[in-house]
Amino acid sequence: MRIRRTFALGASVLVLLGACSTGGGSTSAPSVTTSAVPSVAPSTAPSVVPSVAPSAAASTGGASASDPTIKVGSDGFYEAKLMAEIYAQALEAAGYKVDRTAIGIGARKVSAPALESGQFDLKPEYIGSGLAYYQSGAQTGDPAANQKALQAILTGKGGGITVLDYSPAADQNAFVVRKDTADQQKLATMSDLAAVQSQLKIGVATDCSTNPVCGAALKTAYGIDVSNATKLAACDTPMVQALKGKTIDVGELCSTQPDIAVNGWVVLTDDKATQPAENIAPLVRNDLLGKLADKTGFEAILNAVSAAMDTATLTDLGKQVSVDNKDIAVVAKAWLQSKGIVK
């Protein structure tokens, strides 16, 4: 599911389509009002991730003259376009020709059918939301399970689509605290929060009490009671302002939200995996893979990129694009160079 994120930057407003789910609502997201140097939050991605070394992108695979142009697409919001551009540049560095026409083609209801029909060959996907698109409620907090279930569905779509390795990077619902609160209360995980919940003011989504992955999940897994919590739109300006203004001590945001990096807030690890895992993975049409001279090398390039990305880094890169207004291609290249994936 996608929610709308609105970043208010001075007099201008950028409306961007966000990646995480808040249980069915469509809300606006945070207003970034400070230019402080970002202090990125720890990754909330699950620990089971692919282990392909980043250097594989440079050392494994390479295009053949017979290989077709790779048509790369993505959903329409900045983070999806950024990941698509990163994958595109990594492929170009290995000699593949890339067509970017479909990057930013639209929301999943547009991009998924477009991939199935062959309008493009490759897109980054949030595996929890991708699974929910085809089978509502099937997504879990286990990225491996989400990947497997999504693959089972996509095998029968569009002549077959392959879900490659998922990244440690994930954009999903997360509970966030100010750094001073984290330090004072020694908070790193949701289990830590549970132990001191009576001492803190918690802000949750407006539908948290009736949302099974919010109120019920927090109560069952952690014993956290949100019945008296402050109800605000998750991933939205009021939640951000309440956390900044200390009206609340804990707020529900999206894990790659630029406000986290801008304010140096701390994402509490969902150590019991109550939230649907939204790790990013490339989806590739099987008919394209069948035309490549080195299918294994091609996949290794994409898997290496995915393995090198994490949630904290994606948050910072997203801030550079959506808050600092840096060009997506420039941000993508700088990160790929920092990892030795491109020169």
What are these regions (language model features)?
Residues L16-A19:
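C-terminal motif of bacterial Sec signal peptides marking the signal peptidase cleavage site
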Residues S21-G24:
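Bacterial signal peptide processing site
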Residues S66-E79, Y96-I103, S198-V204:
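Short, well-ordered beta-strand elements
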Residues Y78, R100-P113, N228-Q241:
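Short helix-initiation/N-cap motifs at beta->coil->alpha
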Residues E85-A90, K109-F120, A216-A221, C235-G251:
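Short helices/loops that flank or line small-molecule/ion binding pockets
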Residues P143-I202, A307-T311:
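A conserved helix-loop-strand patch within extracytoplasmic ligand-binding domains
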Residues N173-D183, N279-D294:
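A bilobed periplasmic-binding-protein/Venus flytrap-type ligand-binding module shared by bacterial periplasmic
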